[in-house]
Amino acid sequence: MIADIKKATEQKMQKSLDALKVDFSKVRSGRPHTGLLDHITVDYYGTPTPIRQLANVTLADARTIGVIPWDKKAFSAIEKAIRDSDMGLNPMTAGEMVRVPMPPLTEERRKDLTKIVRTEAETARIAMRNIRRDANTQLKELLKDKLIAEDEDRRAQDDIQKLTDRYIAEVDKLLQAKEAELMAV
């Protein structure tokens, strides 16, 4: 019973950490990468469609992402979706490709992105603490129903606290790395 609670707790914390990594990958840093456009959906014949399902996304050069639509009719819709995203990008059609030049980040934009990243990290920390609280509540129920002894409960709570500390430290490490990436000129 205790092992199941610990395992479920660790799985939930890992999912929260993975979600944070995905959120961080959506935040634009100075360097372009193909995953930057993954969260953009295109209104394709009235259906919101992820950009990856409509086009091949590549790095054209060190400062440009290239989007090559499979359906030539999707050019304008893809361009509009990228322009309307909150990333401050200005795509251009160039032959068979939509070129998305990555302008250098201004100091003000870097600070805004840092605030966003810190907020996402804090949300992940709160999620970790809520998962810990839920696990401790389950342990208290087992103790109340006399299915485990007090010392087992205390040991399990200590283990869950160590798990929480480990995952929160991982969140802090990811946050530090992302902040350093954002502030690098």
Curated annotation (Swiss-Prot):
The set of disulfide-linked cysteines is none
Its GO biological process terms? cytoplasmic translational termination
Localization recorded for this chain is: Cytoplasm
Per its UniProt record, what Pfam families does this chain match? RRF
Q: Does the keyword Protein biosynthesis apply?
A: yes
The main location class comes to cytoplasm
Determine if Cytoplasm is one of this entry's keywords.
Answer: yes
Mention one GO molecular function: ribosomal large subunit binding
Q: Mention any one GO cellular component term assigned to this protein in its UniProt record.
A: cytosol
Q: By its UniProt entry, which InterPro entries does this protein fall under?
A: Ribosome_recyc_fac, Ribosome_recyc_fac_dom, RRF_sf
Instruction: Give the record's keywords alphabetically.
Output: Cytoplasm, Protein biosynthesis
What does the sequence similarity comment in the record state about its family?
Belongs to the RRF family.
Q: What does this protein do?
A: Responsible for the release of ribosomes from messenger RNA at the termination of protein biosynthesis. May increase the efficiency of translation by recycling ribosomes from one round of translation to another.
Protein name as it appears in the record: Ribosome-recycling factor
Which species does this protein come from?
Nitrosomonas eutropha (strain DSM 101675 / C91 / Nm57)
